[in-house]
Amino acid sequence: MSVQVEREGVVLALSHRSGEGRPLLIVPGVMADAASWQGVVDALCTTRPVYVLNRRGRRPSGPLGDGYSVRTEIEDLCRVLDALGTAEDGGALDLFGWSYGGLIALEAAGRHAGIHSLTLYEPVVRPFGLQALDALRRADEAGDLDRAVEIVNRDVSGFSAEYVAQLRRSPAWQALRPLAAPLAQELTALNDHPADLTGYGDLPMPVTLLLGGDNEGVPPYGEPLARIAAAMPRARVRVMPGQGHLAHVQDPGTLARYIVEALDWARQQGAHACPR
């Protein structure tokens, strides 16, 4: 089932698994869409409604548009939260964000009152992937999606040439190509965004930070999470042994269990709301 929300003429589409109780909204990062997260949705042992946002640049949502920035994404997410809060009888939602989607969710949590809890899986903040930006922009200008997929895996995520070669031979490569189209603009927006780490510690809702054990203390994903965790002393950090940055693809069942555990913990903390 799908749901559509509109903001300033741009359609924002979400997948929707129906249920009862407090809704969960999932915000994917770059190189991912709602379909990429379906394995996690299917594995979630909960009866609650689950929504997954197809951010701008992912069909059937609209394009990034002129003047695209992280603020664009934040305002999109706040509009979606407004719409889902109305659809779900005005109750607060539990919000989950991964990677770039984690940054967007984190920023929205400081601006929207309808968030009951926040769970972030390896959110990223600037500086991030700067060494790959020029190459990504050249690939974007050339319309070379294959090259963009290669760059993000090799030069941003740090995967081996062998891994990328295997990925290129797999059916997943064709699904990744269109997801690479907005990548240069998204990475530019991320590095242009002055995230206020000191302000994150003031968020009143329960916060869980999820970290793949393989990334603990190392770039490119462990370091941003460590910085965010240091700025949020009340947040709970959960390390997932044997996982990296792609548990939603490589081990969706395990990631789903950690998400449900975070939601259960948040419920035990009691209801909280973020001031507007």
Could you describe each region identified by the protein language model?
Residues G39-D42, Y51-F96, R257:
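Active-site loop/oxyanion-hole signature of alpha/beta-hydrolase fold enzymes
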Residues P123-A172, L179-A180, A184-N191:
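Helix-rich cap/lid subdomain of alpha/beta-hydrolase
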Residues R55-G57, P123, G242:
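Active-site loop/turn elements of alpha/beta-hydrolase fold enzymes
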